[in-house]
């Protein structure tokens, strides 16, 4: 129970710390608002580099911000920077968080003392700092619960042998292949720095006597995965998705011409294509296949292309092809929840980032899954075989894919045939359950309320 120095009741005050990337910040701010709704106060902390990319933070009673330097306040300039970034983030961030917590606990004013720390994926060092001040910690997991289970079993020597035989059978999880694993665990795509950080996450959870994890999912979607690892108390509190008005998306632009364009299209006729904030890193052969596949359908499309370097992108012949089509519209940004909620959208071509997948689920839009890295490979497996709301693009061992495969997937979802109707019906079913879970009094809402009440 949170109490003041004189013994009176104090509401919980959470320090919420996230990795400085959009995919981490947006769900964290959704969580902050919901924690405040249930009577808590929140200090949100991430790197200055993210603050500079964001719009003006929301002015919300009970929400304050504490920015810290990660050593790269102007952002990463090259791949070489990425090799040392994680260690610098840990070093700079740890020192900054110590100062933030110490200043808060030493305050003699009416400032509410921090009573707990919540930290997201890729910053496991936050839990170490929190323990120095004897503050309880909670992990905010912003990927599928299934992915956390996989990492737990992979880094636990008692289960490591299960990954030596295919198909891989893990407790309470669907059968998977090596290609369905998060890319960091695939031999051909392993990233040593990511593996170190993920291992540290599991080790941090192992040090807790009763580790608690707030998971951006909902019980109906991942019931078995949420109870797969008996030691971990996973609390489903999702989907943490912004409203279709996009008022809490601090990274959106003011370009809304796409709305009028969508209004002019027939119901369920538009292919919406967005491959996330790292779409600029899409391999050229994937961009080529995607371009030819989309154009071959002769269907209207809305394509999100984020140009970091406009002059360089002008040289991209595939970008010129899609811009030259009279059937499509290319924009730099959009309110994704608003687009997915539009009746003209019939299909979502996505990289299967977890935020995008949840937004698709909550909107009831079937998908063509084109995963690239990290948890996206596992999510695509769930999309196609478990939730059955879309189809996954088949990619060769060397990452090869052609335009015909893209066209095949799009037609399978958009054709109106028996399989397409089944996907759409499943999407509508999951939409209803997703909306119900996050609604006031819904399962996820009650779970979060219970989490806050335990700390009061």
From Swiss-Prot:
The protein's annotated pathway: Pigment biosynthesis; anthocyanin biosynthesis
Biological-process GO terms, alphabetical: anthocyanin-containing compound biosynthetic process; phenylpropanoid metabolic process
InterPro entries: UDP_glucos_trans, UDP_glycos_trans_CS
One GO MF term attached to the UniProt entry: UDP-glucosyltransferase activity
Pfam families listed in its UniProt record: UDPGT
Keyword Transferase applies: yes
Induction comment from the UniProt entry of this chain: By PAP1.
Known catalytic reactions: a 5-hydroxy anthocyanidin + UDP-alpha-D-glucose = an anthocyanin 5-O-beta-D-glucoside + UDP + H(+)
Binding-site residues for an anthocyanidin, renumbered to this chain: 24, 374
Catalytic residues identified in the record: 24 (proton acceptor)
Keywords of the record: Glycosyltransferase, Phenylpropanoid metabolism, Transferase
Function: Catalyzes the glycosylation of anthocyanins from UDP-glucose.
Family affiliation: Belongs to the UDP-glycosyltransferase family.
Name the UniProt record assigns to this protein: UDP-glycosyltransferase 75C1
Gene name linked to the record: UGT75C1
